[in-house]
C-alpha cells in the first residue's frame, strides 16, 4: 500500500496580532576588482612619459648635431679661403718685388715644430729642464712652439738634442689628423670625434679639428690652450735613418734649425 502524505497543520492566528519579522543582518557590498591593477596603470603612465621625454631629447640632440655639422662645414670653408688668400698674397708680393727689381723678404715665422732626436744621458740639469719645459720627454717626441725671444733662447740651449724648423700648413694638418691625441682628464685620448675637442676647448671657441689646426697654424690668441690640449706627438723613426745626430744641420748633420726642411723630416717620421 502507498503511504499517504501527512497534511500540514494550519496554525490558527488570533485576529489583531501581527507576525514578528526577524531583523535582517547588515548587507555586505562586494568590491569590484579592476581589470588592470593601479600599479600597472601607474607604470604604463610613467613609461609613456619617459618615452616622450627621450624622444624630445633625441630630437633636440639630432637638431643640435645637424646645426653643429653645418657650422663646422662653414668654418672649414672659411679657413680654406683664408689659407688660399694668404698663399696668393705671398706670391703677389714676391712678383711685385721682382718686377720692381727688389727682393721680397717674407715675415718672420711665428710657429716652430721641435723634434727631440737624442737622449739626455750625462747632460746638464739646465738642458734636461728645458727639454721638460718643451714637453720633449722621449726620443722622437714632437711639439709646436710659439716663436718669441724667450722660446728661441730655450731652443738654442737644447739645439744639439733637437731638430726644429718652420712647418707648413700641410705638415700641421697631417700631424694633427694622423698623430693628434688630446689631454682629457690627464689622459691621452685619440681625437676621433669633434665632440672631444668641443668639450675641452669649446669655452675658447674651438669646437672642431679645423678650429684646432687654424689656431695652431696661425698662432692665434688661444694658441697656448690649444697647444697644451695636444699631447706631445709620438713620431716614428725616420725612414732611411738619421745622418749624424751630433752634428748641426748646416754641417751635414741632423741637429739644429733646418727652417723649411723640417717638413721633409716630418714626412719621413709621420
Curated annotation (Swiss-Prot):
One of its GO terms (molecular function) is identical protein binding. Sequence repeats lie at residues 7-18, 19-29, 30-40, 41-52, 53-64, 65-76. Coiled coil: none annotated. GO terms for biological process: cytoplasmic translation; maturation of LSU-rRNA from tricistronic rRNA transcript (SSU-rRNA, 5.8S rRNA, LSU-rRNA); translation; translation at postsynapse; translation at presynapse. Keywords: Acetylation, Cytoplasm, Phosphoprotein, Repeat, Ribonucleoprotein, Ribosomal protein, RNA-binding. The modification Phosphotyrosine is found at residue 161. Pfam families: Ribosomal_L30, Ribosomal_L30_N. The modification N6-acetyllysine is found at residue 146. The modification N-acetylmethionine is found at residue 1. SUPFAM superfamilies: Ribosomal protein L30p/L7e. It is found in: Cytoplasm. Component of the large ribosomal subunit. The ribosome is a large ribonucleoprotein complex responsible for the synthesis of proteins in the cell. Binds to G-rich structures in 28S rRNA and in mRNAs. Plays a regulatory role in the translation apparatus; inhibits cell-free translation of mRNAs. This is Large ribosomal subunit protein uL30. The gene is Rpl7.
